[in-house]
């Protein structure tokens, strides 16, 4: 009864099953707020991440696929009522110079971050193409018996924010790679 929204998190450039999530949200009259921080450009059923729910939340942190040089992010919605409220809240809650309708705060992106993102947005398809090419190379050379990595389903278009593998002897592989000059990290 207290639940107001579902927040699917599209991790590593791979989208959640949005048909199931949206069906559940519709059944229980819940909002959907997509965490698309790691999935900019990813698609599910030929539709981009951040466009399925009431809101799409994106990060432009320097380590993301579409990044700026500082902390920033952006929000998407296709609902005009939501847009107007968010715009109001992001400008101190001020309707105009003299009327404050809600408590708010400044959350505008600075011009430098916006310009960098605008430039990189024009190159997003190249960035994604490069990441997908790298994934195919890794997958080809690591396609061994005991190395598992997520496959792309026919209705998905993954952008591979990270290349995730699962192996039985993780620590041994990580040490071997380190000795051979290859950095790895254990995520989540």
Descriptions of predicted regions:
Residues 5-9, 14-20, 27, 43, ...:
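PLP-dependent aminotransferase class I/II
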Residues 1-68, 74-76, 81:
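Active-site phosphate-binding strand-loop segment of PLP-dependent enzymes
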């Amino acid at each position: 009864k207290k639940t107001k929204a579902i927040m699917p998190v599209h991790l590593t450039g791979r989208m959640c099953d949005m048909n199931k999530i949206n069906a559940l949200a519709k059944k229980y009259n819940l909002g959907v707020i997509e965490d698309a921080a790691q999935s900019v450009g990813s698609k599910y059923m030929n539709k981009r991440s951040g466009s399925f729910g009431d809101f799409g939340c994106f990060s432009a942190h320097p380590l993301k696929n579409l990044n700026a040089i500082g902390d920033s992010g952006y929000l998407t919605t296709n609902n005009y009522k939501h847009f107007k409220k968010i715009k109001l809240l992001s400008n101190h809650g001020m309707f105009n110079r003299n009327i404050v309708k809600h408590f708010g705060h400044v959350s505008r992106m600075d011009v430098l971050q916006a310009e960098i993102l605008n430039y990189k947005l024009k190159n997003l398809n190249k960035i994604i193409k490069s990441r997908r090419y790298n994934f195919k190379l890794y997958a080809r050379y690591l396609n061994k018996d005991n190395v598992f990595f997520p496959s792309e389903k026919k209705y998905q278009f993954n952008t591979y924010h990270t290349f995730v593998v699962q192996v039985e002897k993780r620590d041994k592989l990580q040490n071997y790679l380190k000795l051979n000059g290859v950095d790895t990290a254990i995520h989540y």
